[in-house]
């Protein structure tokens, strides 16, 4: 435990092996918070006849050029203000979230929209680790609208 704690505080370790210093609790945190809350909300809504469609979370990457990687690492350190978060760790956390959401959709029979498979890129698409530029928000909306139409719904464009 002491060695892992030391690694979490090491900038060299974060830059060279970021996934090895991501806290082991990340998967459990994803299951306990967003996935569990969405499961509860979705079940309540479904019990009232609401059809459920869940879209994945997009994140920068999967491959970034050096300048984008520097920007997203800086952004992670500046905004998250902890010793283990950088672009690779944030990307892994989003991947864990998407895995949890997709699994939830399959187990509950809900429609899954993997927007993260379509929305990729660097600073031309993402303002930071979490937020899209306006053109990418429209892109995401089109992906969701297409999924709604494919599910038998309607979408106004």
Predicted regions and their residues:
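Conserved beta-strand segments of alpha/beta enzyme cores
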Residues: 51, 109-111
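Histidine-centered active-site loop/cap adjacent to the catalytic His
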Residues: 34, 111, 125-157
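Sec-exported extracytoplasmic/periplasmic mature domains
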Residues: 43-47, 106, 145-153
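Serine-dependent acyl-ester chemistry module
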Residues: 1-102, 120-123
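Acidic carboxylate-rich catalytic motifs and surrounding loops in phosphoryl-/glycosyl-chemistry enzymes
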Residues: 114-119
């Amino acid at each position: 435990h002491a060695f892992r704690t030391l690694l979490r505080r090491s900038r060299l370790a974060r830059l060279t092996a970021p996934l090895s210093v991501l806290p082991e609790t990340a998967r459990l945190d994803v299951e306990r918070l967003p996935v569990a809350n969405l499961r509860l909300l979705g079940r309540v809504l479904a019990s009232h006849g609401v059809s459920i469609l869940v879209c994945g979370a997009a994140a920068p990457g999967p491959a970034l050029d050096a300048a984008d990687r520097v920007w997203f690492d800086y952004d992670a350190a500046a905004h998250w203000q902890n010793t283990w978060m950088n672009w690779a760790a944030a990307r892994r956390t989003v991947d864990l979230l998407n895995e949890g959401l997709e699994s939830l959709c399959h187990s509950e029979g809900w429609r899954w929209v993997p927007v993260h498979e379509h929305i990729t890129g660097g600073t031309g698409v993402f303002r930071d680790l979490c937020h899209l530029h306006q053109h990418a928000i429209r892109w995401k909306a089109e992906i969701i609208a297409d999924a709604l139409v494919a599910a038998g719904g309607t979408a106004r464009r």
